Amino acid sequence: MLPRSARAAAIELPPLPYADNALDPYISANTIGFHYGKHHKAYVDNTNKMIEGTDLASASLEDIVKAAAGKPDKKGLFNNSAQVWNHTFYWKSLSPKGGGQPTGKLLDRIKADFGDFAKFKDDLAKAAVTQFGSGWAWLVLDGGKLKVEQTPNAETPLTSPGKKPLLTIDVWEHAYYVDYRNRRPDYVNAVLDKLVNWEFAAQNLG
């Protein structure tokens, strides 16, 4: 048997979809260094420690999150594994060529379900800004309809049957405090105006 150091980790820290300075000046390389290199990595490391030697050791990340959800004895595992999943989804929800408006089917669905793009954008911004404490704002497909949702802490739509997340905004303080201090609305507006990856959301819509 290979020593632990030589074995592949069950859950790995996925590479960023872009360089660590690619989101400048809206999200700095310094923020990415802490957020991705420290926080996201710590969630990965903690998850691997918790599943080692258990029946979840070879499970997929999504299966780990779902298996731990709602179980008091697996709260630590849920928090860490869900944060791995949420963060990976968040990085993909951003793009150095993002912002603006979506096109095609996604824009049509947004107009149908929210009235117009401006109303949707305002709803998503409000969800992100008003989330009390740490958490996430999401665009989800729920029962065939697009909706904006908030989740606290590590909670995720992944564990809700029938819900399909399309994109997310991280509003934990570590996502923005280095660059924006307590100005969460400025961070949220920068994400929506300059960074949100509509192509990723459109792919998730299908």
Q: Predicted regions: what is each one?
A:
Residues L2-G206:
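Feature for soluble, non-membrane regions of globular proteins
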